[in-house]
Amino acid sequence: AASSATVTVKSHGDLLGQVNWGELEQKGQVANDRVKAEIIDSGRNWVHTTVIDEDTGMPIPCRIHFRSVKGVPYAPHGYHSHVNSDMGTWHIDNGGDVRLGQSSYAYIDGTCQGWLPRGEVIVDVARGFEYEPLRVKMRVEPGQRNLELRIKRWCDMKADRYFSGDTHVHFLSTQGAHTEAQGEDLDVVNLLLSQWGHLFSNTEEFIGHPSVAHNGKSIVYATQENRQHVLGHLTLLGLKYPVDPWCSGGSNEAEHGGNLETTLSHWADACRDQGGTVILPHIPNPNCEPATLIATGRVDAVEYLTHAIYGHNEYYRYLNCGYKLPLVGGTDKMTSDVPVGLYRTYVYIPDNEEFNYDNWCKYLRAGNTFLSGGPIIRLTADGQPIGST
């Protein structure tokens, strides 16, 4: 607008005030006793952002969120400013970004670019549990084209031979799982095929062996969660060929009106026959066949999603009956409001053995694990490490 222009503000035909545009541009805001006019967009710059690991001096994968001081989000180009969620992204719009509360984050390889407003900008950067989260208020100056941020690792579990993984992830692509895993400093993702009525998910991802990122920083294994809505669910890790049918017994987990064609015990045996690992997910629900599976030695570990007292009590019932069951952490991620590895399993692999998927599962079965939703645990009992029996 020309500097001589007049901005008129009305409410239901009632004149609240008039402001000269030139004065508003000069002062930023003009007010009277009835209305205040303020310029909230002072212009914008296309900014190239790099996030640096403080220890290595190199760009580091992470998740990042930009917003103005008034709360307006500015996503890096190619990402969503606001990710629809609250189960609105079940099975769709999954991968590349994540929403936590009201903030949508972009997963980046350490670099990104896009429009940022001139003036004060708030930036949030995070990377899993082992890096200090960063929140900074900074200024984007006219003409600025570059921004460098630094994050610092506060502990290094891999240096102590603990490797993290999520046992329970749905709907991501294999490459999307690598991207999100590295952004969350997660070493292993178990990407689970399954069935939801007439919908089959991730069929095309199954290859029967692990996918290792080109930089060796993450492993994704597309495997299965087999489900029956009353008998229970099973996570079958490390499958070399499918265990069919994936789901059985109708409802919304198999074909509508379908019959019960198999049991969890059969699925567990078929997994074990090919060297796989059997996890009882989100203990204790559904809860008809798990007791049989545990009593007959068909379960290698049980998975926590939360620390709800119901699951806690159920787990201790089995311990008190003499069944030694390793605990693992998995998210059951199905939407864009759950970051991969929000609940994760740390598995100890000895110095003389390579970190790979087979060894990760081997030592998971052995119980050399702890699970976490954020805290990092270091303890011994009579000199024995976590997982000793």
Tell me what each language-model feature is.
Residues 48, 63-64, 168, 233:
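Conserved beta-strand and immediately adjacent loop positions that scaffold enzyme active sites
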Residues 1-38, 46, 52-114, 120-156, ...:
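C-terminal functional module detector
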Residues 38-41, 224-225:
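Short linear motifs in intrinsically disordered
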Residues 84-86, 94, 106-115, 194, ...:
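Glycine- and small hydrophobic-enriched segments that form the cores of compact globular domains
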Residues 159-327, 331-337:
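Catalytic cores of extracellular degradative/oxidative enzymes
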